[in-house]
């Protein structure tokens, strides 16, 4: 029979295991929080925010419950909060490993419907996740009712292998969803990350179950008790860090900006997807004359005018309408036969502008919003047509008239005039007769310099 620290906890290896698990959790916490702080990622109410948060919570539950249930720490007195069924059954099971795997299965479920079925999942994540967790809850309730645990929180063989089978069942479910999306040509390595997650979780479960079985069955061997619980906690710590690090969520943030192999960051989904002429306005962007009498939808095709109008709208706290127009405009540049990129862009627009609580939620009619959210084809060319019509009406009613009299339009016209003047000067200096004239010999040199400095000065 095991005795001493092997029985009551507090062996040197136990404290080493606790220290390793604490380090693992802080690494996990830093990997989940720091990227959001560095890149100033906006908080949303969508699953892309809550699922990673739940993963962090379930990881903490898993590590802390293992530490409490296998007697790693020595406590002089028996406290009510050391109740075996609280830690070894409920928190380690449904609220630990079960919740961690359920989050991953939910992500795979979303990928399946979005990229294979080409529509949003029929069940919301906040409903699907508890449904996936139900087998763990039922299993924990049965164990709690039958009370097979002894005073050391150990259960016999008749319970050990069914519990191990429940762990394996969730890995098999993840494999099933991953096989269903294996033919999709993902842009941000989601499929590879899913397979990595399966490999890591399966390997961890094999090691974990082996240590768990040895810990449960051979209670009389002291060194085996100490070694098996050390492996249990350390493997759990490694599992949660690696599992969280392999993220198939929010590709624009976690798959692009945070990859060390990337030499630069993409600020927009259009840039990440390789949409031509996407992103910030370049200073050498060609000026095209703007006629205020032209239709607004035609004027907005002028990139410089659109960005000037967008700055004005942002100053009026109504910039979401112009940002939506630009994102939809870029979405329209993707070829119709490129369904994967169209789905990425459509999903990005939905999460940014359409869903309730979005970063730049638009003031759309309920009918239009539901048409988009319940579409049966995320690749449809007219997916955002009605929403765009409503947005254009809002722009015309609330922004256009004020823009023509704003400082932003005056600045735009000044830049346009300067560009035209510089363009004409460029033609005159390109003649062979004046090509060899130096600045100091040119009687109009000072005048050219003053015009150039005034036109090129940032304003």
Swiss-Prot record:
Transmembrane segments: 9-29, 48-68, 83-103, 126-146, 157-177, 194-214, 226-246
Membrane topology: Multi-pass membrane protein
GO MF: G protein-coupled receptor activity; GTPase activator activity
CDD domains: RGS-like_4 (cd08732)
Consequence recorded when altering residue 436 to A: Loss of endocytosis
PROSITE patterns for this protein: RGS (PS50132)
Keywords assigned by UniProt, alphabetized: Cell membrane, Endosome, Membrane, Phosphoprotein, Signal transduction inhibitor, Transmembrane, Transmembrane helix
Pfam families, A to Z: RGS (PF00615)
Compositional bias ranges of the Polar residues kind: 429-439
Result of knocking out the encoding gene: Increased cell elongation and longer hypocotyls when grown in the dark. Longer primary roots when grown in light due to increased cell production in root meristem. Loss of stratification requirement for seed germination. Decreased sensitivity to glucose and abscisic acid (ABA) in seed germination process. No effect on ABA inhibition of stomatal opening.
Database matches in InterPro entries: RGS, RGS_sf, RGS_subdomain_2
Assigned GO CC terms: endosome membrane; nucleus; plasma membrane
Domain RGS: 295-413
Gene3D superfamilies cross-referenced by the UniProt entry: Regulator of G-protein Signalling 4, domain 2
Chain spans, region Disordered: 429-459
Source superkingdom: Eukaryota
Tissue distribution of the protein: Expressed in hypocotyls, cotyledons, guard cells and root and shoot apical meristems.
GO BP annotations, alphabetical order: jasmonic acid mediated signaling pathway; negative regulation of signal transduction; positive regulation of GTPase activity; regulation of cell population proliferation; response to abscisic acid; response to glucose; response to water deprivation; sugar mediated signaling pathway
Post-translational modification: Phosphorylated by WNK8 and WNK10, and in vitro by WNK1. Also phosphorylated at Ser-435 or Ser-436.
Quaternary state and interactors: Interacts (via C-ter) with GPA1. Interacts with WNK1, WNK8, WNK10, SYP23. The association with WNK8 at the plasma membrane is triggered by induction of glucose and continues with trafficking into endocytic compartments. Interacts with NDL1, NDL2 and NDL3. Interacts with RHIP1.
PANTHER family found in the cross-reference section: DOUBLE HIT, ISOFORM B (PTHR10845:SF192), REGULATOR OF G PROTEIN SIGNALING (PTHR10845)
Function in brief: Glucose-regulated GTPase-accelerating protein (GAP) for the GTP-bound self-activating heterotrimeric G alpha protein GPA1. Cooperates with G beta-gamma dimers to maintain an unactivated but fully functional pool of GPA1. Phosphorylation-dependent endocytosis of RGS1 physically uncouples the two proteins, resulting in signal activation. Free AGB1 is essential, but not sufficient, for RGS1 endocytosis. Modulates cell proliferation, abscisic acid (ABA) and drought stress signal transduction by acting in a hexokinase-independent glucose-signaling pathway.
Domain comment quoted from the record: The C-terminal domain (249-459) is able to bind to and to accelerate the GTPase activity of GPA1.
Name this polypeptide is given: Regulator of G-protein signaling 1
Gene: RGS1
């Amino acid at each position: 029979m095991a005795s001493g620290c092997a029985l009551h906890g507090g062996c040197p290896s136990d404290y080493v295991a606790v220290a390793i698990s604490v380090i693992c959790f802080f690494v996990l916490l830093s990997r989940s929080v720091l990227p959001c702080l560095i890149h100033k990622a906006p908080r949303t109410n969508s699953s892309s925010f809550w699922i990673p948060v739940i993963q962090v919570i379930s990881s903490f539950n898993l590590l802390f419950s293992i530490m409490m249930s296998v007697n790693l720490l020595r406590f002089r007195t028996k406290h009510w909060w050391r109740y075996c069924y609280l830690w070894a059954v409920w928190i380690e099971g449904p609220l630990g490993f079960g919740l961690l795997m359920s989050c991953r299965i939910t992500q795979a479920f979303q990928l399946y419907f979005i990229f294979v079925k080409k529509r949003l999942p029929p069940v919301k994540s906040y409903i699907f996740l508890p449904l996936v967790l139900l087998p763990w809850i039922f299993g924990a309730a049965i164990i709690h009712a039958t009370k097979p645990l002894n005073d050391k929180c150990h259960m016999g063989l008749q319970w050990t292998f069914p519990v191990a089978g429940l762990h394996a069942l969730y890995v098999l479910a993840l494999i099933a969803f991953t096989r269903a999306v294996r033919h999709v040509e993902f842009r941000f390595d989601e499929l590879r990350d899913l397979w990595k997650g399966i490999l890591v979780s399966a390997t961890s479960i094999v090691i974990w179950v082996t240590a768990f079985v040895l810990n449960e069955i051979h209670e009389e061997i002291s060194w085996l008790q100490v070694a098996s619980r050390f492996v249990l906690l350390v493997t759990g710590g490694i599992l949660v860090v690696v599992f969280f690090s392999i993220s198939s969520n929010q590709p624009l943030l976690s798959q692009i900006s945070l990859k060390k192999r990337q030499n630069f960051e993409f600020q927009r989904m259009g840039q990440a997807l390789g949409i031509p002429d996407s992103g910030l306005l370049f200073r050498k962007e060609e000026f095209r004359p703007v006629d205020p009498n032209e239709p607004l939808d035609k004027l907005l095709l002028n990139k410089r005018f659109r960005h000037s109008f967008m700055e004005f709208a942002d100053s009026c706290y109504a910039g979401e309408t112009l940002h939506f127009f630009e994102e939809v405009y870029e979405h329209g540049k993707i070829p119709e036969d490129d369904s994967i990129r169209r789905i990425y862009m459509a999903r990005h627009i939905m999460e940014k502008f359409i869903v309730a609580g979005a970063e730049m939620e638009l003031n759309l009619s309920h009918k239009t919003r539901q048409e988009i959210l319940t579409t049966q084809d995320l690749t449809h060319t007219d997916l955002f047509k009605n929403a765009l019509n409503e947005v254009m009406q809002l722009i015309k009613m609330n922004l256009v008239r004020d823009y023509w009299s704003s400082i932003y339009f005056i600045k735009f016209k000044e830049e346009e005039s300067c560009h035209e003047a510089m363009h004409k000067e460029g033609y005159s200096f390109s003649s062979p007769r004046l090509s060899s004239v130096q600045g100091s010999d040119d009687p109009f040199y000072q005048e050219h310099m003053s015009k150039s400095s005034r036109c090129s000065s940032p304003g």
